[in-house]
C-alpha cells in the first residue's frame, strides 16, 4: 500500500560437491628450527631431518584422498620408510581400501526471509520488522591427515574401522532470527532509532562410519546459541555542515554444548581423581555493550570528512570434550575477543561528480585474539582444531576507493588497502618448542632452563603479524556498456584485476602462502529482462595456495602393534620430561581453482 511494504523471499539450495582440494606438506620437508619434535627423532622414519618447522612459501602439490579403493600407484609420503621392524610398510600404511564411507560435501539448505516496513499513518515515523529462518542438513567427510597415508585398523564387530585421521559427520542446523525497529524520519535535524534483536541457533552432530554411512541415529554433540540484543541511535545536525551520530548496542549471548563421549571431567582439585561421565556439558553467557560514535563535517558540497570511534566484541565459546581428552583442560573454553576501533577519512565526489574518491586511515586494538590450534583426537586419531586466545594485537591501515566515469560508456575503478598487523602481547607453546630445540613450554615457569634445550627458547610472538592476513590488497576494474542493434540491446564488457600479498600461515612468521594476481572478465549482450554472455575467472591461471595452516604428520599414530614398536625414539635424546616428542608438524593447504571459462544466461521475471 502507500504506507506499507512487504518483501518475502524463499531460497532452496542443493549442493553435491566432491572432496575438498587439500594437499599436505610432509614434516620431512621442514627446513628450520632443529629440535626433538621432528621426524628425525624417530627410528621408524626414513629421514634424519631434525627440523621442526618450515620457513618459506607453501607451494601447491598433489592431492591424495582415502575415499575410494586405490586402483593405481602413487609416490610414498616423504619421511615414511619402506619397512617397519623388518616388515614391508606399504600394505600397512597405504591400505588400498576406502578409509572413510563419505568424502566431500552434501548440503540441503532452505532459507526464508521476510521484511515489513510501515510508515506509521503516513507520519514519516517507521516500524520495520525483519525475520528469517534456516534449515540445513549437511554431510561432510575428509581424510584429515590430508596425505596418501591410509592406515585402517582391524574390523570392529565385522565392520570396517575408519582410517586413522579420517572423519565424517552429518550436521543439522536450525535457526531463526527477528528484529523490530522504530525510527524517526531520517532527514530530520534530530533523528533516532530504537530496536530489539533475537537469534536462536541449534546444531546437532551425528558421527558417520561404515556401519552408519548416513549418520548415526543419536547425536554425538549438540550446540546451541541464544543471542538477544537491544540497540538504538541518535543523530543531530548541529549545522548544515556538522553532524554527529551515537549508536549503542547491548547484547547477551548464551552458548551451550553437550558432548556425548566418555571423557574425564576436569578434576576438582590437584589430588582429585578424574571422573568419567557420558557427557561433557558447557553452558555460559557473554555480555557486551558496543558503542559507536560518528562525526561528519562537510568541507563543501562535494567533500565530507568523518571520524569514527567504536568498540566491538566476539563472544567466547567452548572446545568441550576434545580439549579435555587431549590434555588441554584449560582450553575447555575460550574468552571473548574485544576490540577498539578508530577511523578518520574523507568521502568525495569530484570533477562534476565523475570521480568518486574515498580515503580513510584506521587503527584497531584487540584483546584476547581468538585463533585455532590443531590437535589429535586421542581416541580416533582424527586431527581437528580448537579455539584459543593467543594474546593481544593491533592493526593500523589505510583504505582507498575510487571510481571514475571516463566516458559515458566506460567507468574505471581502483581500490587499495594496507593492513599492518602485529601482536603486542602473547605466548605460543609451539613457538617455544621450535626456538628452544623442542623443549616443553611450562607456563608456570616460562624461563625454565631445563626445558630451554638450546638456550634460545622464547615463546613470545610479540611483533609478529597476524596469521592469514594479507598486508596489501588492491584491485583495478573496468566496466564498459553501450547500446547496440538500434538501442534495444546493450553490449557489456567487465574486467577486474586483483592483487593480494603473501599471508603468514601461523603466528611464527616464517611459513606463508604466496601472493596472488587474479584476473576476471565478462562480455555479452543484455536487455532490461535478460543477459547472455561469456565469463572468465582466474584468466592468468594463478596457482598460489588459497590458504594453509600448521598441521600434524600423523602416520606415527595408529600403526597396529603387529608391526612392532614402530614409533620408537632414537637413543641419546633428551628426557621426555623436558623435551617434546609429540607428532611432528606438517602443513596442509588448499588449492586454488584453475582458469575457468563459461557461458551465463540470466532472465528476470
Language-model segment annotations:
Residues 1-192, 356:
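Outer-membrane beta-barrel domain signature, strongest for Gram-negative TonB-dependent receptors
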Residues 3, 182-185, 191, 197-199, ...:
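Structural signature of Gram-negative outer-membrane beta-barrels, strongest in the C-terminal barrel
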Residues 3-6, 124-127, 188-192, 241-244, ...:
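Repeated loop/turn-to-beta-strand initiation elements of outer-membrane beta-barrel proteins
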Residues 12-16, 133-137, 198-202, 250-254, ...:
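Transmembrane beta-strands of outer-membrane beta-barrel pores
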Residues 97-102, 163-169, 177, 181, ...:
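Extracellular loop and loop/strand-boundary signature of outer-membrane beta-barrel proteins
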Residues 115-119, 124-132, 137-144, 298-316, ...:
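Membrane-embedded beta-barrel scaffold of Gram-negative outer-membrane proteins
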Residues 240-241, 363-365, 386-506, 600-604:
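Gram-negative outer-membrane beta-barrel transporters
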Residues 498-506, 525-605:
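C-terminal beta-signal and adjacent terminal beta-strands/loops
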